[in-house]
Amino acid sequence: MKLKEVLKKLEYNILNGNIEIDIENIQYDSRNIKKNDIFFAIQGYSTDGHKFIESAIEKGAKVIVFDKGFENENMYKDITFIKVKNSRKALAVAASNYYGNPKDKLKLIGVTGTNGKTTSTFMIKSILEEAGFKVGLMGTILNYIGDRKIYAQRTTPESLEIHKLFKDMVDSGVDYCVMEVSSHSLYLDRVYGIEFNEGIFTNLTQDHLDFHKTFENYYNSKLMLFKNSINSVINIDDNYGERILKEIEEKTFTYSIKKYSDLKAESVRLHSRGGEFTVDFKGNKEKINIHIPGEYNVSNALGSILACVNEGISLKVIKRGLEKLSGVPGRCEIVTMGYNLGYDVIVDYAHTPDGLDNVLRTARDFTKGKLISVYGCGGDRDRAKRPIMGRIGTELSDLAILTSDNPRTEEPFSIIDDIVKGVTKDNYIIVQSRREAIKKAMTIAKKDDVIVVAGKGHEDYQILKDKTIHFDEREVIKEIIEELY
């Protein structure tokens, strides 16, 4: 492909070489460079791609795109150097050009918020498929192209991978792509230049302050989605949803369980396996059943319903789509069904104060016996939330078992010490090994008790100081059942 075609719609200065040359592939990781590739030097979270420009050239890069700090271009007469204002934004535009601008051939629905992104995208996918569309999904758990699964490395990939996935979706006949859009991806321009048909806001609570530094920065990152959405679908039960309404001029639609809104849930009834509620949209009423418990999942369903109504899908089709979704991996997932233990074990991804609060309150509503929680906090992440989660877990549980959760480079007991600082009750024990903590809970549990294992959900790994090990809580719980019973 001609370099000038890759650089379409970009403002740039040619410092050396020319743009009439052919290039092979686009790369932002110098380790992947091959002969005649174009290398985009981007600032990463922990390292700066500009440090690897010379390494990329040695490996065969023909073109270097950068935005700062490289002054040796005159040393490389055969290399084309392109200076841009922002190499991350340039990468996003170039990636789209390189893959034939597949984003323009898809209808895109983006979901952002601290919690609820994954569940919402699975709900929307199920509804759209019930309406007869072929659907792609990008998310925390998996990427889907129709029924084909592609395992995800992070919530939102880099822009290069996004546009490659878009192309694969277009080539496979996908009509809609439903995306989890993280605050990182918005701030780091991974979704730069993408216009969404529907942008959905679920909620905003404390998380990622290790990255964003302040809550205001975190909010402003989320806000960016709605400046690039045709329709904005906003949860006004969340105070930040109310604020978004005041700050964006785009077409807005509201949903709520508690307030007057464009779409409101009425007659909400919750139970241990899900819930039911009625929606009324412009005089059309429909009773909806969902198979994921918790009031917060009624809220996730409302956002999904409203976005799909905006896309012209009837409430009857939406009802069928939601009722066909049996659950979402690692989201309030009861993993002991069929074992007849007398108690339930729930696995949930809750790794934020609000997420932990939600899942424990939901479990409490259907717990006849004692509620036991097993959780920790991730290492090298927002330390401020640790004592808050310590307080929430002990206040809402009869017994909290504090343990490890991806400690990364930190000492596990140091993280647990931070959690304990927020504890105001003495109903907790510390079991540093996550497997042993789960086993301890299952040893203690009696008839009608509920155990909530929070923090990892769908994850099948544990990140330690010097390695990542396989750790799937469903498998672990099954092994423990075989050991104990």
UniProtKB/Swiss-Prot annotation:
Example of a GO cellular component annotation carried by this entry: cytoplasm
Subcellular location: Cytoplasm
UniProt KW keywords: ATP-binding, Cell cycle, Cell division, Cell shape, Cell wall biogenesis/degradation, Cytoplasm, Ligase, Magnesium, Nucleotide-binding, Peptidoglycan synthesis
Reactions mediated catalytically: UDP-N-acetyl-alpha-D-muramoyl-L-alanyl-D-glutamate + meso-2,6-diaminopimelate + ATP = UDP-N-acetyl-alpha-D-muramoyl-L-alanyl-gamma-D-glutamyl-meso-2,6-diaminopimelate + ADP + phosphate + H(+)
Entry function: Catalyzes the addition of meso-diaminopimelic acid to the nucleotide precursor UDP-N-acetylmuramoyl-L-alanyl-D-glutamate (UMAG) in the biosynthesis of bacterial cell-wall peptidoglycan.
Pathway terms, separated by semicolons: Cell wall biogenesis; peptidoglycan biosynthesis
Needed co-factor(s): Mg(2+)
Family affiliation: Belongs to the MurCDEF family. MurE subfamily.
The EC number(s) this enzyme carries: 6.3.2.13
Post-translational modification: Carboxylation is probably crucial for Mg(2+) binding and, consequently, for the gamma-phosphate positioning of ATP.
Source species taxonomy: Bacteria, Bacillati, Bacillota, Clostridia, Eubacteriales
GO biological process: cell division; cell wall organization; peptidoglycan biosynthetic process; regulation of cell shape
Motif (Meso-diaminopimelate recognition motif): 405-408
Keyword ATP-binding assigned: yes
Name of the protein described by the UniProt record: UDP-N-acetylmuramoyl-L-alanyl-D-glutamate--2,6-diaminopimelate ligase
One GO molecular-function entry: magnesium ion binding
Entry-annotated residues carrying N6-carboxylysine: K222
Binding site for UDP-N-acetyl-alpha-D-muramoyl-L-alanyl-D-glutamate: S30, T155, T156, S182, R190
Domain of life: Bacteria
HAMAP family: MurE
Annotated positions binding ATP: G113, T114, N115, G116, K117, T118, T119
Keyword Cell wall biogenesis/degradation appears in the UniProt entry: yes
Residues involved in meso-2,6-diaminopimelate binding: R381, D405, N406, P407, R408, G455, E459
